[in-house]
UniProtKB/Swiss-Prot annotation:
Mitochondrial protein that may have a role in mitochondrial translation. PROSITE patterns: PPR. Residues 186-218, 648-669 are annotated as: Disordered. GO terms for molecular function: ribosomal small subunit binding; rRNA binding. The lineage of its organism: Eukaryota, Metazoa, Chordata, Craniata, Vertebrata. Keywords: Mitochondrion, Repeat, Ribonucleoprotein, Ribosomal protein, RNA-binding, rRNA-binding, Transit peptide, Translation regulation. This is Small ribosomal subunit protein mS39. Its main location: mitochondrion. Residues 1-13 form a transit peptide. The keyword ATP-binding does not apply. One of its GO terms (cellular component) is mitochondrion.
Length: 669
């Protein structure tokens, strides 16, 4: 489908734009050379400059919790779920306090601060101006009361008093920003809006395939057909460029790209000029208007040429929008992305971390990307290493997480160290994003460490990152266990198991069975074998029903066998035999290796009765090695004549049961 805007012909590259913008930049540089330099008589410091200077004198404490929590062992989270619960609880309490103060401001008028501190006093969120007037409309717009503002606007029109263009534009700004919905900060939301949203969501969900990724517009909510923003825009007797630009940006934000370009066409037909924010929004929406990659790029270039015609100077977000759209243009986007970066440099626009994040997205599509294309991260780090960044684009917070993903897929630990050093430079750690992005970054970093480094380095980072910066998931702990296995440091497993319990992963079956498997695989020295047995008993308690325990693990043959073997090797024969009895109660069958391990223990203890009991147990489970087991007992143990007869009877009963089962199988055939 052709874009509903004026076409200016096909464009091979953006060289014309580069020459235009470079000329503009040279003109500004020449004008700046004639300006007088004004040296300030004193240095103006930020209000928090002293605190920042003090913060730089203190290094990170790996044992400290996040600053948002109380310095109390009971109130410090130990798991990722507790971190989320505690942080949400604290934020919920803060919001509840704000709601109470905002709802009943008259109850909080006691001002004890000297001098007066306005931010400590409650804000008045209730309308003070009664009646139908433009001043009342302005007040409700200021209070972000969308439904009341729309009702008051309609009443003014019905009374024959049209609000001014400035007031109407402010109302349009409010409606387009929130997508014709009440702001989420309001506790009490319009029931009608909730019902409309629910009905529309059910319609969208019925059309959506299971497992399909959701767009940002789907998370925010879609642009509803003939909503109040469009209605008010059509009722406006006079419209200026601000009116059109606001409507276009709202349509793009809530996923109505086609309507946005139609409105942009109307703007140009009215001989008005769009601002840079509107062009940025249209560039982001351009890939949704076309199917082929080259057509998407042609539409982006066309919008850039419109900016040249209308003398609209691009900013950082303009180029970041171009790069973000190029991520949807396939392999042809790589050369175009480099051209975009060159134009930024020609305009003296400093790239942000979001710029480099989009560049990585263009060049790196996954672990199967050619090596030559993935070296772009090394070149990016060469350029930005050692520099301090500030937040200039909302997408800046995705750089570190996505760059660490590239390092993990490439299995390049040196690149990861360089990236982490950049993250530790100055205040760059403040650009890590929310808790989820931070956890993803550190999780990928720790995963790469477990794959590529020796155990000493891994444990150094383990103590530094966990749990002050990172709460590992079960996958991260499995990686650590595999690293311990690779470096033959299984003696650390009891301590690691305590950490697994502390961070809340003791209910993960895969992780628990991996711990048991590593401990039971080889015979260890007596002291370590005793520690393994204590750990096995601790794990055994997780399978038992107890009060106030919601999740109880289910016994498997592997877990029963490994715990039995660990107890037997530590000389705890009675406890090991009790574990062996659990096979029958839990309808599990022990492996031949478990029975052989018990027989070896019985031989060490010269316990003939235990050996005979093992043969009886093997007969009960119809194990295939029962005959050999009985022969081994008669050869290796001092058995009495009565015991020998018992063993021979067990052999015969096992042979007869085996032959009967074979004959029944042949009859079925």
């Amino acid at each position: 489908m052709a874009a509903p805007c004026v076409r200016l012909g096909s464009v091979r590259c953006t060289g014309t734009l580069l020459r235009y913008f470079c000329g503009s930049a040279r003109h500004q540089a020449a004008a700046a050379s004639h300006e007088e330099i004004d040296i300030p008589r004193r240095k103006s410091w930020d209000k928090t400059a002293v605190l920042q200077a003090l913060a730089y004198t203190v290094s990170h404490d790996p044992t400290a919790a996040h600053y948002m929590f109380q310095d109390d062992p009971f109130l410090v989270p130990k798991t990722s779920s507790e971190f989320r619960l505690y942080s949400l609880s604290k934020e919920s309490g803060r919001n509840a306090a704000k709601y109470i103060i905002g709802t009943h401001p008259k109850l909080f008028q006691n001002d004890i601060a000297e001098p007066h501190i306005p931010c400590l006093m409650p804000e008045n969120f209730q309308p003070q101006i009664e009646g139908v007037s433009e001043e009342a409309l302005k007040e409700r717009i200021q209070l972000r009361r969308i439904k009341e503002s729309i009702d008051l606007f309609d009443q003014l029109l019905q009374g024959g008093t049209a609000p001014s263009l400035e007031t109407t534009n402010r109302l349009l700004d409010l409606i387009c920003f929130y997508g014709d919905r009440e702001p989420t900060r309001d506790i009490q939301t319009s029931e009608q809006n909730q019902q409309d949203d629910q009905d529309q969501q059910e319609t969208e969900d019925s059309k959506k395939r299971p497992g399909q990724y959701r767009k940002a517009s789907e998370i925010l909510g879609s642009w509803r057909e003939n909503n109040n923003a469009e209605r008010i825009f059509n009722l406006m007797p006079e419209r200026n460029a601000h009116s059109f630009c606001t409507l276009i940006q709202g349509m793009v934000k809530y996923g109505s790209s086609n309507k946005a370009f139609n409105t942009y066409t109307d703007l140009m037909n009215n001989r008005l000029t769009a601002d840079v924010q509107t062009f940025n929004a249209l560039i982001l929406a351009a890939p949704d208007m076309k199917e082929k990659y080259n057509e998407k790029w042609d539409l982006i270039v066309e919008l850039l040429k419109h900016m040249v015609q209308q003398n609209v100077r691009p900013n950082l977000l303009t180029f970041n929008s171009v790069l973000k759209s190029l991520r949807k243009c396939g392999t042809m986007a790589r050369g175009l992305a480099l051209q975009t970066i060159n134009e930024m440099k020609a305009l003296n626009i400093e790239p942000s971390l979001g710029t480099y994040n989009h560049l990585l997205g263009v060049f790196y599509k996954g672990a199967l990307s050619p090596r030559g294309q993935t070296e772009i991260l090394s070149e990016v780090l060469d350029e930005i290493e050692g520099r301090s960044f500030t937040l200039r684009d909302p997408d800046d917070v995705y750089f570190f997480t996505n760059a660490m993903r590239v390092c993990l897929d490439l299995k390049d630990i040196e690149l990861a160290y360089r990236l982490h050093a950049l993250q530790q430079t100055a205040d760059n750690r403040g650009l890590m994003g929310d808790f989820y992005l931070q956890s993803t970054y550190y999780g990928r970093f720790f995963n790469l460490l477990c794959m590529m480094e020796n155990i000493d380095v891994i444990l150094k980072w383990y103590r530094e990152l966990i749990p002050s910066l990172y709460y590992p998931n079960s996958r991260g702990m499995l990686d650590l266990l595999q690293a311990l296995d690779m470096d033959n440091c299984l003696d650390l497993i009891p301590q690691i198991w305590k950490d697994i319990k502390q961070i809340g992963h003791s209910n993960k079956v895969e992780l628990v069975e991996e711990v048991l498997k590593l401990m039971a695989r080889d015979v260890q020295p007596a002291e370590l074998q005793a520690a393994f047995a204590d750990t096995a008993l601790d794990i055994k308690s997780l399978y038992e029903v107890r009060d106030r325990v919601r999740i109880v693990l289910e016994w498997s043959s592997a877990s029963l066998g490994n715990i039995s073997v660990l107890l037997a090797r530590a000389g705890r024969t009675e406890e090991a035999w009790k574990m062996l009895q659990r096979f029958k109660t839990n309808h599990r069958v022990p492996s031949t290796e478990v029975v052989d391990e018990f027989l070896s223990r019985a031989k060490m203890d010269a316990n003939t009765n235990l050996a005979i009991s093992l043969v009886q147990l093997a007969v009960g489970f119809s194990l295939p090695n029962t005959g050999k087991l009985a022969e081994r007992v008669m050869e290796e143990f001092n058995v009495s004549e009565e015991q020998r007869l018992t063993l021979e009877d067990l052999q015969k009963s096992h042979s007869s049961s085996s032959s009967s089962s074979e004959s029944s199988d042949s009859d079925r055939e």
